[in-house]
Amino acid sequence: MEETYLDLPIFHALFDSIKNDPEPQRSVSMKGLGTALLAGYFPIINGWIITQSRIQAAGSVVLRVQHYLRMGRDGQRPARIADHLLACVVHDTQDWSNAMEELDGLSAERWNVENGYCWVVVFHGLDVYFFCYRQNRPFGERYAGCGTRFFENGEEFIQNKYHLQRDTALIHEIMAFMASRTYILYAKNSFNTEP
């Protein structure tokens, strides 16, 4: 069986802190959990850069996973750094949808996304939500949930909320997929909504 983040002792320590420690240590551990998970799937050795955004939403922390877009034949100088994934770490006592609304208002002007699309991950305590951000959509329609497709009473649904301890294999699969593909490839080759 393939190893996941749950096999690493640091994640057990972070989970324990989030469940049992008083504030402000819980907040620090929530931010650390989001950052550590991203660093595991987007390592610097593969050309990824994880930075904290200057733009913050509703008291949460916004992280940007970026990569260089090369320009010219020499391939030496990056034209710009594109946002491949945006992550929002929201304290479990806060409403994460408020942070999403604020991000939606800021995103069209501020994010440097490639081809108008990128991944979005929201960490809310021990829950994680996965989205695709579509820059050219109207306000309120820029984020589409992505995850596991299922059917109920003949209707199709997308499950995009997962628990970091119980849904380890699914989260691992989604994070690995996000690390290896841009959103535009995902939209063309999967069950999710059109780009």
What residue spans do the PLM features occupy?
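A short, conserved, highly charged catalytic patch centered on acidic carboxylates
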Residues: 1-119, 127-130, 134-195
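Charged, structured surface patches that assemble and position nucleic-acid processing machinery
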Residues: 124
